[in-house]
Amino acid sequence: MLAELQFTEARKEFSALYNEVFNSYRPMIIKRKQTEEVVVLRTDLQKMLLSGFSLKPEVLHEADGSITLALDQLDIFVNAASLEEAIKELIEDVKTYAQDYMQRSQLFINAPNRRPHFPYVLRVLLCENDEEIRGLLEM
């Protein structure tokens, strides 16, 4: 089982908590009241946990010569004149969706068709730039 701290203790000893999680690679659970729990985890370990959530879009060559990229995991689809334009549009749409998802997280987490998007959204939001997002898309 993971180590647990009560919220008040975690607040008082935040520096020690941070050092334990970061330097010792040990996630911790912080509890408040009877039902509220959060996990504190290093970002690199979170990225590792999410690495299995692949975001590889399907590439469709349309009859008019355009390219459609279909990212079924997030229900995002783009169409552009070239593959490179479609990739750029997809990256922008994925970023916009991820930001919107987090701004309205209570809505999306409680929507049965959007709840499964959470790990993909978090994976995108942990990227530092468009190149990292492009890498996630394997494009």
Describe each region flagged by the PLM:
Residues 19, 23-56, 88-139:
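Short, charged, surface-exposed hinge/linker loops at domain edges
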